[in-house]
Every structure is written in C-alpha cells, then in structure tokens.
Amino acid sequence: MRHYEIVFMVHPDQSEQVAGMIERYTGSITEAGGTIHRLEDWGRRQMAYPINKLHKAHYVLMNVESEQAVIDELETAFRYNDAVLRNMIMRTKAAITEPSVMMKAKEERSAKREDAAPRAEEAAAE
C-alpha cells in the first residue's frame, strides 16, 4: 500500500455536510483495508483566489495509506460531487502523523486565549 496526502475544498454553503462527506470518504478507505493516519478539518478559510465567484471554502486534509484503486475511486467521487470545488491527491514517501502547520497555529492561538482568560479574570477581581 502507498501513502497519500489528500486535500479537498468544499463549497461554503455545504459546510454542514462536510462531516458526512468525511465519514463517507474515510469509510471507503478503511473498508478496502486502508488506514487514516491524519485527518484535519481546517474549517472555512479564505481562498487565495476566487473559484466560481466564491472567496471562502471549507478545507479538509487527510493522510492515508491505501491501494491505488481506492484512490481512483475517491478521485472519481470528488469529480462528480458538485460540492467539492478543488481537490489534490499527492503520493508521499511515508505516513505523516504529526499535526500540520495550520493545526499547530490553531492550537497555539487557542492556548493563548486560555492563558489570557484567567489573567483577565484576575485583573477584574483586583
């Protein structure tokens, strides 16, 4: 089996259905004997350039280990799903399991907010 990194962008009006799409795509990979090494839902983000007069999209990143036939099936599913604006499937040399730069930055921001909240409460109490 080979390792792949998959990124796809979903129409912002279909953001509620992203969880179902992820479940469907990961289910097809695991049913065929593949494994999901990393799954990150980056949420709605600004795109670098407009696509179909849209400026935002819902981003999802997956690192998987699977057979080529499953990846071909997944690519066909992306092609015929109107909600998927763009997708990219890249073959990688090894499984990538650590959080991406996007998720690390998100975790750092949330940690800073958690640190700032007790300080604000202490300042208000004084």
Swiss-Prot record:
NCBIfam families, sorted: S6
Organism field: Aliivibrio fischeri (strain ATCC 700601 / ES114) (Vibrio fischeri)
GO biological process, one term: translation
Keyword vocabulary terms for this entry: Ribonucleoprotein, Ribosomal protein, RNA-binding, rRNA-binding
Protein name from the UniProt record: Small ribosomal subunit protein bS6
A Gene Ontology molecular function term of the record: structural constituent of ribosome
Family: Belongs to the bacterial ribosomal protein bS6 family.
Annotated Gene3D superfamilies: 3.30.70.60
Region entry Disordered, spans: 101-126
Job description of the protein: Binds together with bS18 to 16S ribosomal RNA.
One Pfam assignment: Ribosomal_S6
A GO CC annotation given for this chain: cytosolic small ribosomal subunit
Compositionally biased intervals (Basic and acidic residues): 104-126
Superkingdom classification of source: Bacteria
